[in-house]
Curated annotation (Swiss-Prot):
GO terms for biological process: ribosomal small subunit biogenesis; translation. Gene3D superfamilies: Ribosomal Protein S4 Delta 41, Chain A, domain 1 (1.10.1050.10), RNA-binding S4 domain (3.10.290.10). The gene is rpsD. NCBIfam families: PRK05327.1, rpsD_bact. HAMAP family: Ribosomal_uS4_B. This is Small ribosomal subunit protein uS4.
């Protein structure tokens, strides 16, 4: 299954939760989900009972769309999380959080993970001084993530950094807004990660 590239707000309405796919519109209260908090389509406002499988599938879709990960890659991450010590669901979320595009987003260099992924793909991001253009690159604690010199004054990046005054920056990164770089100081604990996903249901889905 390829990565979804369609209208992102339809996805949020279908899943019934904000996935931080539209940065400024969400912060301004202008997202389609807030205006129409029901699934798109002719019968969107009808309430229907969701099966156990449907609930499990919905949680997987939330995580996939939120982090921008295709099915094959997501399944491989789950297998890796399952081999690790500790809680499989929490391991999965922590692996997703360590993706380079997500770390760029968490540092406030992009208002959405989608824009962060574009920055990485187009070579605007350096890791420990070297250009890395792979969004799934796994960041390690202590690594320096920086926007390359020619791109630091990009209006979208600067606007993203301005918005962090309103949204804040997560505690597991240290960011220098003026020099546009940050340090991934540690792997976050699950309770620190503010995503509306019940990973337990994802584990149940893949364990069948």
């Amino acid at each position: 299954m390829a990565r979804y590239r369609g209208p992102v707000e339809k996805i949020e309405r279908r899943l019934g939760v904000s996935l931080a796919l539209k940065g400024e519109r969400r912060l301004a209260g202008k997202s389609a989900l807030e205006k129409r908090p029901y699934p798109p389509g002719q019968h969107g406002q009808r309430r229907s009972k969701i099966s156990e499988y449907g609930l499990q599938l919905r949680e997987k879709q939330k995580a996939k769309f939120m982090y921008g990960v295709a099915e094959k890659q997501f399944r491989n991450l789950f297998k890796e999380a399952n081999r690790m010590e500790g809680n499989t669901g929490e391991n999965l979320i922590k692996l997703l959080e360590r993706r380079l595009d997500n770390v760029v987003y968490r540092m406030g260099f992009a208002t959405t993970r989608r824009f962060a992924r574009q920055l990485v793909n187009h070579g605007h991001v350096l890791v420990d001084g070297k250009r890395v253009n792979i969004p799934s690159f796994r960041v390690k604690p202590g690594q320096k993530i920086e926007i390359r010199e020619k791109s630091k004054n990009n209006p979208q990046i600067q606007r993203s950094l301005e918005l962090t005054n309103q949204t804040g920056i997560v505690p597991w990164v240290d960011v220098d807004k003026e020099k546009v770089f940050g340090i991934f100081t540690r792997i976050p604990e699950r309770e620190e990660i503010d995503i509306p996903v019940e990973e337990r249901l994802i584990v149940e889905l893949y364990s069948k």
